[in-house]
Every structure is written in structure tokens, then in C-alpha cells.
Amino acid sequence: MNALTLTPGALTLKQLRGVWRHPTPLVLDENAHEAINQSVACVEAIVAEDRTAYGINTGFGLLAQTRIATHDLENLQRSLVLSHAAGVGAPLDDNMVRLMMVLKINSLARGFSGIRLSVIQALIALVNAQVYPWIPSKGSVGASGDLAPLAHMSLLLLGEGKARWQGEWLPAKDALKKAGLEPITLAAKEGLALLNGTQASTAFALRGLFEAEDLFASAVVCGALTTEAVLGSRSPFDARIHAVRGQRGQIDAAAMYRHVLTDTSEIADSHHNCDKVQDPYSLRCQPQVMGACLTQLRHAAEVLLVESNAVSDNPLVFAEQNEVVSGGNFHAEPVAMAADNLALAIAEIGALSERRIALMMDKHMSQLPPFLVRNGGVNSGFMIAQVTAAALASENKALSHPHSVDSLPTSANQEDHVSMAPAAGRRLWEMASNTRGVLAVEWLAAVQGIDLREGLKSSPLLEQARQTLREAVSHYDDDRFFAPDIEKAMELLDDGRLVALLPPVL
């Protein structure tokens, strides 16, 4: 694996997706060292001059007015990390932990946090050695930063807590020792710089974005397959229709459908002069609905890319002016709203897919055997698979409720408005899994429907999608144990087998 040279503030979505998907060695751009060192010098000057500055020689939250003696500053930072590591729930997997750590490294290395280069390099060493801290998935409200998750991340630097090394959970000190690493001691402000920030919220939402992007592409292919299976018209994808409306997402979505449908299709030729005037909305309005979803994905991508490269701790060190300034960049409201928009898109992608599945079940609408199987009555075919899709799509409607409008005061009302961004992002994973299940059923159903079209072939790309599935799941001549087929189709979707048929979505 080639190392990623981290230029602070310049990470791309492609790089972040790679970090999420697989271990990625990091090298910090040497040009970042000067800004980091200057911010540390500013903090050290404040301590030496005995000036009062929040987070450097004061307490935190409601205790910000409490002045801390110089000889207690190291203990202050250690106590902060220990006390704030109060999360609950299942631990995050290695991929999520790695993404979160890289986001934190990227932010700290911008040089506005007053944290030593050696501490940043210690975090990089953990990533490179694949020593991952035990971080519970719950416990942050997304302001003042993701305190609990980032505290659990930071415990490992101190040799506290637990960590995973080579797939095994170990006491942190043991994991560090096995990896040839040593615990460190934090200096003034460094604990707060590590804990304060939106990196957990952003990592959660980024995973949702990456999964939504793949689901969108897969849904375009599945929708096109269904269009072919039920002898749907291609006229709704005509570029002129979408050009006169002018919605960019819709225009681009229609182009994606045209890309996979093309003009070379025996199925399309077979009903070119039929009497059917218009298709149901779940077919005809695919560009409009999916285009709106694409617009939401692109907006969320823009917000999350900015946040991935942001400095979001507090206070911030402006070394050129020799000032430490308190603000609120830790508030993850932009991330929460982006995650809420992603939730709407993921829910709608699944909801539209489920309606297409239902259409295929109805012999009057699809012109196919009931429930896509011969000898109906003896065979039930896709009857209950469609029910499963309906259950998943409906569940997502409840999960898509916005989190960004929720707030609950914390820290004795000092932190009286919060974003709930972590929960907003985390629920996207379950929603993505649900929509993947719906699309798996549609893929199975649409390919079965095309199989039943008397040997006619679809477009070249859709035939690839059909062949990919048929190499793993055979045609349904009679009823059989259905769940393993859905599971297999979901695995293929998760592996990006349909995504590869389209140009990049974002």
C-alpha cells in the first residue's frame, strides 16, 4: 500500500474513502511543521508569562473560570482525557477508528491547535502500526466537539484504556509495547486540542456519504433493469425533458440511465411500437426522484469535505498575532444537517426501489407471471421478498427523522445548544444496510423478470449486471430457501459490482 502524504487541509473525498476502506500508511508533509511549531511556541509563551487563557491554564466548560496553577497543567490535560472517556455502546470498527484518527491528525496539523509535532507524529505512528483504540460508538452530542469518542481515542496515547492490535483487544500499554511504541505525556492545551473537534461526527457522516454514493449508482442500474423487465419506455430519460427543467441533479441522473440503457436492446426493440402511453411514476419519474437525491448527496459531499479539512477545536491559536481565541468551531451543526439530508436521500432511494419491486409482482402492471415465477400457487416466488423490501423501506422512513433540530443542554447549561451530529451520522449506516437489502431484492427480481422475456437481451451494460448476479445466484424455476440469495446479492452490492458500471456519481 502506497503511503498517503498528508498535506493538512487538502484531503480529498477519494483519499478519505480509501482511508475508510483499508489501512493507509501516513506521512506528514514537512511543510506543515513550521505552523505546528509556531502554535506551540505561542502556547508556551502564555504559560511562561503566566497569562490566563481558556483551555491552557483554566478548567473546562462551566469550570472555565477556575485558574489552574502551572505545576498542575500536565495533570490537567491527563485528567481531562480520563474523565471525558465516558462513552458507551459497541466499539467502532477499525475502519471507522482509522478514518476518525486521520481526520483528527489532519485538523491538528493545520497549526492552529497548539499541539506539539511529536504528539501528532504519535497519532500517525498508531495509524501506521494499525493499533486502534477502543472507542464506544455512543456518548457524543456533537458539541462541545465529540468529546467522549475523541477522549477514548486519546487514551491510547497515554497508555490507558484498550486497543486492538492484529485483531486482538489488549490493554493499551500492552498493545503499544507489541507495536514498539511508548505512551506520551501531554503538555498544556494538548488534551483539549485532541478532544475538541468534530472528527467523530464527520467520520460517521462520511461513511454514510460513501455508502449513499454507492447505493445511488446501484439503484440506477437496478432501476434500469426493472425498466427493461417490465417493458418500460425509454422516453422519460430523453435529455430534452430534463434540460428544460434545468435541475442539474435530474439532468445528470437521466444521463446515467441513458448510459446503462443505451439504444442496443432486444427487449426495447420488442415493444418499440406498443400501445402503452405512459409508465407508472416509479419508472417514469426515476430521473426526477433520483436527481433530487443526487443533489442532496452532492451538497452533503461539499459540506463534509470542508469539515474534513477544518480546524474545529477550541480555543484556536493564531500564532502570527500571538493570540488564543475562543469560539465555537466544535459545533457540528453543518455535519448534522448534511447527515439529515443524506438520510432523506438514502430513504428515498430505497422507497422508489421498493415501489418498482411491487410493480413487478403485479402481473397486470408487469406483463410477467405473478410474483415472477412459473406455476404460481405451488410456487410463491418473490411474494415475501417484496414484503421484506417493504419492511426495510418503511423502517428507513422512521430513521430519516431529522436529528439536527434536536438539542439537549449539557454541562450545567453552559453548553446549551448541541447538534446531535453523531447520532445523525451513525443511523445512516443502518439506513444504508436497509436500502442495500431493498436493492438486492430488486436486482434479483429484475433479472428474474428479464430471464422470463423469452431469451431477449437487454443493453450490454445491463447484461453485465445480469451476468454478475447469475454467476452467484441461479434462476428461480421453483421455490427455494430465499434468504441466502438476498444475502449474496447484498454482498455483491457492497463490493461495488454495480457501481463499476457507471461513471463517478459525485
Swiss-Prot record:
Instruction: Give the enzyme's EC designation.
Output: 4.3.1.3
Q: Name one GO molecular function term.
A: histidine ammonia-lyase activity
> Where does this protein act, in terms of pathway?
Amino-acid degradation; L-histidine degradation into L-glutamate; N-formimidoyl-L-glutamate from L-histidine: step 1/3
Q: Which InterPro entries match?
A: Aromatic_Lyase, Fumarase/histidase_N, HutH, L-Aspartase-like, Phe/His_NH3-lyase_AS
PROSITE patterns (alphabetical):
PAL_HISTIDASE (PS00488)
**Broad class of where this protein is predominantly found:** cytoplasm
- Read off the Gene3D superfamilies from this record: Fumarase/aspartase (Central domain) (1.20.200.10), Fumarase/aspartase (N-terminal domain) (1.10.275.10)
Which residues are annotated as modified residue 2,3-didehydroalanine (Ser) in the UniProt record? 144
Q: 5-imidazolinone (Ala-Gly) cross-link position in this chain? A: 143-145
Q: Which Pfam families match?
A: Lyase_aromatic
Mention any one GO cellular component term assigned to this protein in its UniProt record: cytoplasm
Broadest EC class assigned to this enzyme: lyase
* Compartments (UniProt record): Cytoplasm
Query: Which catalysed reactions does the entry list for this protein?
Result: L-histidine = trans-urocanate + NH4(+)
Keyword line? Cytoplasm, Histidine metabolism, Lyase
Query: One GO BP annotation here?
Result: L-histidine catabolic process to glutamate and formamide
In what way is this protein post-translationally modified?
Contains an active site 4-methylidene-imidazol-5-one (MIO), which is formed autocatalytically by cyclization and dehydration of residues Ala-Ser-Gly.
Family named by the database record: Belongs to the PAL/histidase family.
The name this protein goes by in its record? Histidine ammonia-lyase
* Native species: Enterobacter sp. (strain 638)
